[in-house]
Amino acid sequence: MSTILESLPTGQKVGIAFSGGLDTSAALHWMKLKGAVPYAYTANLGQPDEDDYDAIPKRAIEYGAAGARLIDCRAQLVAEGIAALQSGAFHITTAGVTYFNTTPIGRAVTGTMLVAAMKEDGVNIWGDGSTYKGNDIERFYRYGLLVNPDLKIYKPWLDQTFIDELGGRAEMSEFMNQAGFAYRMSAEKAYSTDSNLLGATHEAKDLESLESGIKIVNPIMGVAFWRDDVKIAAEEVTVRFEAGQPVALNGVEFKDQVELLLEANRIGGRHGLGMSDQIENRIIEAKSRGIYEAPGLALLYIAYERLVTGIHNEDTIEQYRENGRRLGRLLYQGRWFDPQAIMLRETAQRWVARAITGEVKIELRRGNDYSILSTKSPNLTYQPERLSMEKVASTFSPRDRIGQLTMRNLDITDTRDKLRVYAQVGLLTPGESSALPQIKSDSGE
């Protein structure tokens, strides 16, 4: 039997991930009128653009929900965000600027915690606002079924009857007004925004055009650093890690990591730190574009990466980066709790993060412009006296280096022989003005 229901299951409990916005409000009331028994579940993810979470379940009851619950997901969200940071689970970058996978992390937390709450209430049918062209429909599908194998999926936006009756925001607003709720449709923005405590995503509408840039976005976690009228003073900040966990900002220790990340958001946000413009591949392989904010994670990541490079050796760092990119893709695809992801994540947390203890001082300026001012750690393997150009006691002598270079003759000879072979088979041609062979063009010239 299919786990996806294409029509409303009347007379049955249907859980809906309820944001309180127009779409989910109209869907909930519509389901009630059509004979379903809707239950509303709201995730408190610390969204920076939401100021009254307690009012959301009350609105759900008003619109016809048989039950409504507010689930505090903030601690779990921050824990998963720090786990992603420790693992370097970020695969989308442009010219060194990183997207911190904040929406995929949020979906992992929401998809598991809301379905767990539904299961407690005997609700085994789940709906949410994700569309069939996006990533979230698959992420929620995977996480929901991981938690509840008996789960069925009903999405109003996949139900043709719902689409025919309430196919757009204007129709939804009129539907709510006719029902007596005086629901005013919010002003249309030039793009869509989704956010949580870790970061914000701006996409769709005008941002689908690559001719529209970051300047049309109004940041919700920071400042528009590209505007000349926005005054931003340089600021020094210290970040301290202990055994891979961020514990202090500017010398102030935080026992609660949610509070630490909120403060990191405030500090980074004052500069517009962590904003990026990315073109990415969705799960279905089509390309999309997003403008992202993550001021707090960006601040922590600068300090964490600095300590990683000062503490670990080259091969460990290489493996950390390669595995981090693989893990980032798994996270993006909704596989954060799959065995292969857990294996990569646990390895990084155990063998990379646990050694990360120290303090980094950073000067923040505008946007992603910053300088590292100092790095301190009892675990540093960076020891400048080993390579000092000054006359100091050295760990090896000139004769030692001569011997090491002499050993290189073997692989240099091998390389020269291989280049000769490539020239003989026509892959290379002798260069006229160079002692090295040149690669031939496809035309043979």
From Swiss-Prot:
SUPFAM superfamilies: Adenine nucleotide alpha hydrolases-like (SSF52402), Argininosuccinate synthetase, C-terminal domain (SSF69864). It comes from the Bacteria. Its EC number is 6.3.4.5. Pathway: Amino-acid biosynthesis; L-arginine biosynthesis; L-arginine from L-ornithine and carbamoyl phosphate: step 2/3. GO terms for biological process: argininosuccinate metabolic process; L-arginine biosynthetic process; urea cycle. L-aspartate binds at residues 131, 135-136. It is found in: Cytoplasm. L-citrulline binds at residues 99, 135, 139, 192, 201, 203, 280. It is an enzyme of class 6 (ligase). Keywords: Amino-acid biosynthesis, Arginine biosynthesis, ATP-binding, Cytoplasm, Ligase, Nucleotide-binding. It catalyses: L-citrulline + L-aspartate + ATP = 2-(N(omega)-L-arginino)succinate + AMP + diphosphate + H(+). The keyword Nuclease does not apply. ATP binds at residues 17-25, 43, 129, 131, 136, 194. InterPro entries: Arg_succ_synth_type2_subfam (IPR023437), Arginosuc_syn_C (IPR048268), Arginosuc_syn_N (IPR048267), Arginosuc_synth (IPR001518), Arginosuc_synth_CS (IPR018223), Arginosuc_synth_type_1_subfam (IPR023434), AS_cat/multimer_dom_body (IPR024074), AS_multimer_C_tail (IPR024073). GO terms for cellular component: cytoplasm. The keyword ATP-binding applies. GO terms for molecular function: argininosuccinate synthase activity; ATP binding; protein homodimerization activity. Pfam families: Arginosuc_syn_C, Arginosuc_synth. Its main location: cytoplasm. Homotetramer. Belongs to the argininosuccinate synthase family. Type 2 subfamily. This is Argininosuccinate synthase. It comes from Burkholderia vietnamiensis (strain G4 / LMG 22486). The gene is argG.
